[in-house]
Amino acid sequence: MRHTQRRTRSARRGTATVEMAIVLPVLIALVFGSIEICQRLHVKQSALIAAYEACRVATRPISDTADVQTHAETLLTQQDVKQATVSIRNMTQAKNNINNIVTGDEIRIRVDVPWGANTVSHYVIGDSAGSFRVEAFMLRE
């Protein structure tokens, strides 16, 4: 009787070890995958907020291209968004600056951000290829 109980107990321990060996990597992948997705959402939202806020600055009558560029880059730096490119365009006059813009002209702020510089996974799996782009449009006041 005792011999049977010992065998059953050690078989259960072996089963638990095998289950943990299978489930633990899945749980780790799930946790790190969730962290990666949340970080990418945060970076994208930060870039969108920077584009929107820069567009708000651009709509003011007293602002110029340098003010808008500086404001967008400051917001991106504060949110730790790396290697972002900000472009400012007067869509109505088809110019890449907002100097000499008139009331009612459409302004576009575009922010391009590479994934590789802004995610944790590039330390593990190498440089993440690709980038994303966000845009904000407003009319000059």
Regions found by a protein language model. Name each.
Residues 2-76:
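Alpha-helical assembly-interface signal, strongest on the long, hydrophobic N-terminal helix that forms
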